[in-house]
Amino acid sequence: MKLSRISAINWNKISDDKDLEVWNRLTSNFWLPEKVPLSNDIPAWQTLTVVEQQLTMRVFTGLTLLDTLQNVIGAPSLMPDALTPHEEAVLSNISFMEAVHARSYSSIFSTLCQTKDVDAAYAWSEENAPLQRKAQIIQQHYRGDDPLKKKIASVFLESFLFYSGFWLPMYFSSRGKLTNTADLIRLIIRDEAVHGYYIGYKYQKNMEKISLGQREELKSFAFDLLLELYDNELQYTDELYAETPWADDVKAFLCYNANKALMNLGYEPLFPAEMAEVNPAILAALSPNADENHDFFSGSGSSYVMGKAVETEDEDWNF
């Protein structure tokens, strides 16, 4: 029987320095939800209205659905088309962290919410047409045979579709509510920013190898897909935030992040500045230096609890 040759990855021979740069960023950013003291948010959770609590749970089940899609189908679907073995390794890290993100929302639920309410939110996520529709649109391209269209879909998921949900914890954080939960969401946002940047970078590297006509065709596809997703996201936002006055602010946030997604692909913004004008309080809450005392880049800080070993002497225990 003839055996297929398997090549061992060699991190000492790298053809694209970006692979090592992003690998190092992702591994240095590694975190787990168990280290964030979510229980400190219980008093704030109890001050939210029933509508706000239900909205929060629905937002987080929607985000969990997208993380599950990216973990199980999205990142793995990109691996066969990787340009380097190191790119495959980075994509495997991305896939794993999407599973961590999905796990994180369950940590929030188990800490703050009643099981029956969480079950109702999960049932809602399976029945909500716009939420299921956006997952189906993205999944359709992941299961297709065009590697560049897969990357476009992945960047739009990472850099755009999450943000109708991310808006809510940033809003609460800007008002001093659920601040530890917001810290956890910032860790997720930090990861997604790197994921979207890296996959967009790889898209642009692949674009260098194709004809001008193919590039124009893919650009047209990207803008058409974004508009399809945007129209669906408007409907999702209207349904999700129906009992609040916040839908218009969320839609501005969508335009802002849609433009960022296009920039990750190397394209010009689609939405004019007046449509993408985000409330400064939301942008401040997104900042690495937001008031939750979180070191955004190292993953350390007062809200991310890591045990430290300190050597002691016998006399230290004489109280």
Swiss-Prot record:
Enzyme Commission no: 1.17.4.1
Induction behaviour: Induced 2-fold by hydroxyurea.
Pfam families linked to this entry: Ribonuc_red_sm
GO molecular function: manganese ion binding; ribonucleoside-diphosphate reductase activity, thioredoxin disulfide as acceptor
Binding residue positions for Fe cation 1: 67, 98, 101
Entry keyword set: Deoxyribonucleotide synthesis, Iron, Metal-binding, Oxidoreductase
Cofactor dependency: Fe cation
Cofactor note: Binds 2 iron ions per subunit.
Reaction catalysed by this enzyme: a 2'-deoxyribonucleoside 5'-diphosphate + [thioredoxin]-disulfide + H2O = a ribonucleoside 5'-diphosphate + [thioredoxin]-dithiol
Alphabetical list of InterPro entries matching this protein: Ferritin-like_SF, RNR-like, RNR_NrdF-like, RNR_small, RNR_small_AS, RNR_small_fam
Role this protein plays: Provides the precursors necessary for DNA synthesis. Catalyzes the biosynthesis of deoxyribonucleotides from the corresponding ribonucleotides. R2F contains the tyrosyl radical required for catalysis.
UniProt record similarity statement: Belongs to the ribonucleoside diphosphate reductase small chain family.
Name by which UniProt lists this protein: Ribonucleoside-diphosphate reductase 2 subunit beta
Organism, scientific name: Escherichia coli (strain K12)
GN (gene name): nrdF
